[in-house]
A protein has these predicted regions:
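Fold-independent oxyanion-binding glycine-rich loops
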Residues: 14, 18-19, 37-40, 45, ...
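Catalytic cores of large soluble enzymes that bind and process phosphate-bearing ligands
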Residues: 2, 15, 19, 34-41, ...
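Active-site-adjacent helical/loop segments in soluble small-molecule enzymes
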Residues: 20-76
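Alpha-helix capping/termination and helix-coil
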Residues: 18, 50-53, 72, 86, ...
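Short, hinge-like loop/turn segments at secondary-structure boundaries
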Residues: 1-4, 53-55, 98, 153-155
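A conserved regulatory-domain signal marking ACT and ACT-like small-molecule sensing domains
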Residues: 89-189
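Glycine-rich phosphate/pyrophosphate-binding loop at beta-loop-alpha junctions
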Residues: 1-29, 66-114, 124
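A generic structural signal for well-ordered coil/turn residues at beta-strand boundaries
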Residues: 10, 30, 51, 59, ...
Length: 189
């Protein structure tokens, strides 16, 4: 048995530094393999279960789904027991947001535009032509000391995944806009 110095995870229902004295003998007798999963795998499992099965399962209860990605189960009948729905709405929202960002379905980019009428429209037309769905748009004239040098446009978009995200960014670049992906973690701010 190994004692951990700390147990920090979004799966707080199983975040223990030391296995319990009563449970450990059963685990030792009946478990033939253990896996170490990180929180990003739980976020992926949460989004999969929510989108595909329309279920809300707390993080500790998602461990079997996350573990399946590490096991060779093709062609086999496998049952994953999902348990627990003890999750507050803020946590749920955070998991969905992080999952969508990881999958390239939400992303933010910044671009410098000339400060003249029509610049924003040109970007909007490229986004529309490439099926980019705007979630948030910030047109900031005050980011540069000299407004004559341009304005900054930050756009948070919904996309279909990483390939679609790259298609949108490449379409902007092909039209002369130097679009740079930025941190999407604060897109609600």
């Amino acid at each position: 048995m190994i004692n951990l110095p700390a147990a920090t995870t979004i799966a707080d229902g199983v975040a223990v530094k030391t296995p319990g004295d009563k449970v450990f003998p059963y685990v030792q007798k009946n478990v033939d393999r253990t896996l170490v999963l990180d929180d990003s795998e739980l976020v992926e499992a949460f989004l999969d279960v929510m989108e595909r099965h329309k279920m809300v399962v707390e993080n500790a209860g998602l461990l079997p789904v996350a573990a399946l990605r590490h096991l060779d189960c093709r062609g086999k009948n496998v049952v994953s027991i999902l348990s627990g729905g003890n999750m507050d709405v803020i946590t749920m929202s955070s998991l969905v947001q992080h999952g969508l960002i990881r999958r390239g379905r939400i992303f933010t980019f910044a671009v410098q535009l000339p400060d003249r009428p029509g610049s924003l429209l040109a970007v909007a037309q490229i986004l529309a032509a490439n099926n980019g769905n705007v979630i948030k748009l910030e047109h900031n004239q005050f980011v540069n000391i000299n407004r004559q040098s341009g304005v900054e446009l930050r756009v948070t978009l919904e996309a279909f995944g990483h390939d679609h995200k790259e298609q949108i960014l490449n379409a902007l670049r092909a039209q002369g806009f130097h679009a740079v992906e930025t941190d999407t973690a604060d897109f609600y701010n």
